[in-house]
Amino acid sequence: MPLDFPGTPAGYSVLSELSDATYLAEAIVFISTHPTARNAAFNVTNGDSFRWSRVWPLLAQWFEMPCGVPRPMKLAKWMEDKGPVWDKIVARHGLEWRSLETIASWEFADFVFEKEWDLLTDVGRLRRAGFNACVDTIAMLHSQLENYRDARLLPLARSHPSSGRLLGSRLCWMVRASRSSSSI
């Protein structure tokens, strides 16, 4: 079964940005404690951009699935009745139980995947204030999936060396997180 992109063809091709939660927290601490950031509003994103058309095949490979095509769907609606299916996956693979509703915000996922315009957020003001950290989004996604797998929230891959039967990653990610340190 292919891993289809749950947005439109336009959404698959436009420039997008994401924000790593740890990076966002670091930025908030910086903004709230540095005089150079006083009384100003800031955009906080990872500092890079990507196209889902380039990232989605990597995600499909991580899950050991063929990469599908854009297939518009409302995940919030589609996932409404999938709790029992998720519970069976959790039981079959011995995962830590979390309700499907707490694993992801499907409404937010719809917002992210439905966007049909380029999004390039100006983080220049934040840089000029002295916060120069950044996160490589592709490496961030890989790291988050690995963290979910290590926490037993996602199954291991069939090919994963620690399990002959579960879901993980044989994918060799070429990009490392390019996080520079900030003085927070």
What are the residue ranges of the model-derived segments?
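Short, intrinsically disordered C-terminal tails of secreted or membrane-associated proteins
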Residues: S180-S183
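Acidic, Ala/Val/Gly-enriched low-complexity intrinsically disordered segments
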Residues: V175-A177
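Aromatic-acidic/polar surface patches that form glycan- and anion
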Residues: S13-A21, D48, K115, L119, ...
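Aromatic-glycine-rich donor-binding/catalytic loop that engages nucleotide-sugar donors
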Residues: P9, R128-N132
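Mid/C-terminal beta-alpha module of Rossmann-like enzyme folds, strongest
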Residues: L24-A109, E114, D122-G124, R128, ...
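Short, well-structured beta-strand/strand-turn elements
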Residues: F131-M140
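A conserved pocket-lining segment of Rossmann-fold NAD(P)-dependent short-chain dehydrogenase/reductase
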Residues: M1-S19, N43
